Design a protein with these regions (language model features):
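A short acidic, glycine-rich active-site loop
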Residues: 50-62, 196-208
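Protein-protein interaction modules outside structured cores
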Residues: 205-208, 227-241, 245-283
Length: 283
């Protein structure tokens, strides 16, 4: 990974995002700290009388300079942008290996993640890491959720394959758990006489999905322990539960931004909104 974009503002969550990016960036990586400012709108008009844009820009410049100076990391480059924070981050993310954002996490998952995080998740094609939960440390143990959606031949067009390959590239990873969860209400409830046999078949099919994705992802990096987890339950719930003991959860998304995948995909959005650990959404 050579380019990591981080959204920076005055929140504690933003500071956690920047620290997370520094922990996972190789020594030769560029960490682009983006701080966006804009003139607030009041009733549809710029509050030109009460707010001086030059003062806003000066304050934003000073803030960003102080943040980078306090860190003292030569890999961090400050970028000041004027405009909508989400759009500014999407533009800065061009060619990046990932975008890292902090999530404030209040109320109903902060009403679908918060406007900036939600915008970036839906409009960039780059992997997005949402820093949430109580653990912001190095991602030593990573859970990668996989499914059988995508290309039949297991090529890189399969979102799960891309997600696993991305996890392989993450600096400092020691253990990766590849998880596939399945849920068939009628089978799980034992409605059919053959429910027991059907569940065994579903378990075997889940194990095959995991093997299929792992084969397509190619060789894993040396020094990384790989485990397979076939779980009974809805994918979102299973991954959220797994996040309790994980440092990072990685999910693939079939969306390409905008309305190409409504609300990003139910599992990706559910995990990003409710995980107990940071979440990476990989396109």
């Amino acid at each position: 990974m050579t380019k990591i974009v981080v959204g920076v503002d005055a929140s504690d969550e933003s500071g956690a995002a920047l620290e997370w990016a520094r922990q996972h960036a190789p020594d030769d990586a560029r960490i682009i700290a983006v701080h966006a400012w804009d003139v607030p709108l009041v009733a549809g008009y710029e509050a030109a009388v009460a707010i001086d844009p030059l003062e806003l820009e000066s304050a934003a410049t000073t803030f960003l300079r102080d943040v980078t100076a306090q860190i003292g990391d030569s890999r961090v480059e400050a970028v000041l942008a004027q405009g909508h924070p989400g759009r500014s981050l999407v533009e800065a993310a061009d060619g990046a290996d990932m975008v890292v954002l902090g999530h404030r996490g209040s109320g109903k998952a902060s009403i679908i993640l918060g406007s900036t995080v939600n915008y970036v998740l839906h409009h960039t094609e780059r992997p997005v890491v949402v820093i949430r939960g109580e653990r912001f440390g190095p991602a030593r143990r990573v859970v990668v959720g996989v499914d059988d959606h995508g290309s039949e031949d297991g090529s890189s067009e399969n979102p799960s394959v891309r997600a696993l390959r991305w996890a392989y590239q993450l600096h400092g990873v020691q253990e990766i758990a590849v998880m596939h969860a399945w849920f068939a209400p009628a089978v799980a409830a034992g409605i059919f006489a053959s429910a027991g046999a059907d569940m065994e078949q579903m378990d075997l099919a889940a194990a095959e999905v995991i093997e299929h994705v792992m084969r397509a992802a190619g060789p894993m990096p040396s020094g990384v322990t790989l485990s397979r987890v076939a779980e009974r339950g809805t994918p979102g719930f299973a991954l959220i539960e797994a996040s309790r003991s994980a440092d990072l959860v990685v999910v693939g998304s079939r969306g390409r931004g905008g309305f190409a995948e409504l609300l990003l995909g139910s599992t990706s959005l559910e995990v990003a909104a409710h995980s107990h650990s940071p979440v990476a959404v990989v396109r």
